[in-house]
Amino acid sequence: MNSIRKFERIIAIDFEFATPPGEVPGVNCMVAYDICSKRWWKLDQRECLDRRSSPFPTDPSTLLVCFYATAELNCFKVLGWEMPARVIDLFVLQRALYNGLPLNWLKPDLEDQKLGRGLNDSLLFHGLHEFVNPEKKEMQQLSAAGGPFDSTTMGALIEYCTSDVAATAALFGKLAPKISQLPKGLDWLIYAGAYQKAVSSMEIRGVPIDYPLFTKMRENWEGIKTGLIEKVNANYGVFGG
């Protein structure tokens, strides 16, 4: 498994979505690009929701390349698509390579810039300036609003999503030769992707709670607090309210 060449498809992918507080993502669109065949897939919201499976194979012959994979895996989950067998995350790869080192310290020409760990900053760090999207924050806010979207707005979202996928593919080209620097190389990175699939399952399922008990506690919270205060104060006298 320690060779990228074994994969029939290496697919960079990105979803745009909206996630209301406490809810699972609502998918707005998806764009994917096979780095090997140079084939694109572009799906709007309705096309995503109407599909029962991914438009490309997700078996072990496909390597899915993401930047912050949990977000994309969550979208697979909510759409009911089969989870990809092999996933790598360029965000994780970059952190593994440079963790603890501010990126601007490593590049003299960027020493005056405070670089974060997001996609745009990673592109700058690796000299991929032409892929930096200056409208990224605005487009993220547009997607987060959740629609409904007219055809013009949906077209803009797909165009933005396409630019992120192109950037992810370009960043993969820069980082792929460095995978061998990891202690277990590609195997380690794929194991990290398997962990992110588990994280995605937890995020989509949510925190398991006893909801009837939670409701009862919430309805009686003031009395519970008063009882706790009285119990603690009997021994320590720390609450003077």
What role is predicted for each listed range?
Residues I13-E16, C48-S54:
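Short alpha-helical segments and helix-capping/turn motifs at coil-helix boundaries
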Residues S3-F7, P55-S61:
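Flexible, charged surface loops at secondary-structure boundaries
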Residues P21, N28, A32, C36-R52, ...:
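Active-site-proximal helix-loop-helix substrate-binding element of RNase H-like nuclease domains
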